[in-house]
């Protein structure tokens, strides 16, 4: 009885103790393995939850996969809002004139909306049809310089007159061939020159060349002072009776 009650006595071990110990260890290991399997099955049942996306209704087994998918949706929505804001900015920019661009964007709209009326004709590729801008009208010529009875024309020259059969019925006096006619006087029948000639430059003789004679300096011609033009006709007749030689100074040299 003493030996049976003392389990710590190694000398009185039974013969089948190793077998019994192995059986007991196997039983304990199998029980623990069954418990682990049961725990894993319960964990699988717990992890079998399905996570659904709020945007596209996709289902995920793990919350991490759903989080990455939701981040992509957020990025897409952010880029969409940015694109909408850019479109609004472009629309507001097209309303303002091209010279007052606040953001420095290049205008892609039709530039003919803000073109000037006096600009040069241009062809714009963005417009529906090629529009040619008309040139501004030329300013009218200045009116003739009004000469009074005591004032003389600044274009009057001396000894620079010649005859030219260009105008008939009237005679026009011009200081030089390069300047326009400044005074036109209708001569009567008592004029020494036949009607239908223009008096411009030095007088021409019967040979067709300028008449050579003493150079006489006279006062410039004045416009008509009366209704009938007597004073102007007398001065012009007096100047035409005396020949003028504008080449005397050259021959004297």
From Swiss-Prot:
Induction: Stimulated by GATA18/HAN.
Keyword Zinc: yes
PROSITE patterns named in the record: ZINC_FINGER_C2H2_1 (PS00028), ZINC_FINGER_C2H2_2 (PS50157)
GO cellular component labels: nucleus
Zinc finger (C2H2-type): 51-73
One Gene Ontology term of the molecular function aspect: DNA-binding transcription factor activity
Chain residue ranges for the region called Disordered: 1-46
Localization of this protein: Nucleus
Tissue specificity statement from the Swiss-Prot or TrEMBL entry: Expressed in the emerging leaf, sepal, petal, stamen and carpel primordia. Not expressed in the apical shoot meristem (SAM).
Disrupted gene: phenotype observed: Lateral organs with serrated margins. Irregular shape of floral organs. The double mutant han-2 jag-3 exhibits reduced petal numbers, more serrated sepals and narrower petals.
Coiled-coil region: none
Additional facts recorded: Plants overexpressing JAG form bract-like organs on the inflorescence.
Protein name per UniProt: Zinc finger protein JAGGED
Taxonomic source organism: Arabidopsis thaliana
């Amino acid at each position: 009885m003493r030996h049976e009650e003392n389990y710590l006595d190694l000398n009185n071990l039974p013969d089948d103790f190793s077998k019994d110990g192995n059986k007991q260890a196997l039983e304990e290991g199998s029980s623990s393995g069954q418990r682990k399997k049961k725990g894993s099955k319960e964990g699988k049942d717990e992890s079998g939850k399905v996570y659904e996306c709020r945007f596209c209704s996709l289902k995920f087994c793990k919350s991490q996969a759903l989080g990455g998918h939701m981040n992509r949706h957020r990025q897409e929505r952010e880029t969409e809002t940015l694109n909408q804001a850019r479109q609004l900015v472009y629309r507001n920019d097209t309303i303002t004139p091209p010279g007052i661009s606040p953001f420095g964007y290049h205008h892609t709209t039709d530039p003919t909306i803000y073109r000037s009326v006096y600009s040069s004709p241009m062809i714009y590729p963005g417009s529906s049809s090629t529009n040619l801008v008309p040139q501004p009208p030329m300013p009218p010529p200045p009116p003739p310089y009004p000469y009074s009875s005591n004032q003389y024309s600044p274009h009057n020259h001396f000894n620079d007159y010649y005859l030219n059969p260009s105008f008939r019925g009237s005679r026009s006096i011009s200081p030089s061939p390069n300047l326009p006619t400044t005074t036109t006087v209708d001569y009567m029948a008592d004029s020494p020159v036949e009607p239908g000639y223009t008096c411009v430059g030095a007088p021409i003789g019967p040979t067709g060349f300028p008449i050579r004679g003493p150079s006489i300096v006279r006062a410039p011609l004045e416009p008509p002072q009366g209704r009938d033009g007597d004073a102007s006709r007398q001065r012009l007749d007096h100047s035409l009776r005396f020949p003028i030689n504008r080449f005397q100074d050259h021959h004297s040299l």
